[in-house]
């Protein structure tokens, strides 16, 4: 199946649709070729043991279905309250078929999933910083274009370049601390003032 074909993603999803049967402990989230696994346990030692055991089962399922996990793109995050420290870093391992051995996955403070930056404390700081960076660039574009194109096209630019970042995943990050939301509000107001500037 060609990589960029229209049927490719659908057929791949059908092919891996029963991967969840490989483990009773994980919750699987599948989107196109992006798969995320979650597991919850208050005891870090139990978590380490269970996750390693279950990842072994997932690896066996992948091998049986002639699929290879991209170990370089695989990592994990431990979600926890800000005040709770991790007493040790769990060694989460997955089988690497290229090296024919188990390798330790990298623990991250945050991960990007479907365009949303999710950090270990669910503070959404990384995601807000990411959005602010993207919106700042778009505000710069509007600032340059405001003298050359009519207002309705500037509004189109706003809805194409800025609004999607403000709307995407807002159900997840929209309840973040007000100080983070204020950063977005300042940028949004700046963009709208630039659009209004022509007619003020």
What positions do the PLM features span?
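Short, conserved non-catalytic motifs in the polymerase core
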Residues: 1-11, 38-44, 99-101, 107, ...
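Active-site palm subdomain of RNA-directed nucleic acid polymerases
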Residues: 9-38
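Structural signal for well-ordered, non-membrane alpha-helices
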Residues: 20, 56-63, 136-143, 163, ...
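Catalytic palm subdomain of template-directed nucleic-acid polymerases
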Residues: 24, 36-60, 175
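Hydrophobic packing residues in well-ordered alpha-helices of helical domains and bundles
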Residues: 28, 48-51, 55, 69, ...
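Short, conserved micro-motifs composed of acidic
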Residues: 53, 68-109
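Short, charged alpha-helical motifs in flexible N/C-terminal segments and linkers
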Residues: 59-78, 171, 180-200
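Basic, alpha-helical interaction scaffolds
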Residues: 102-172
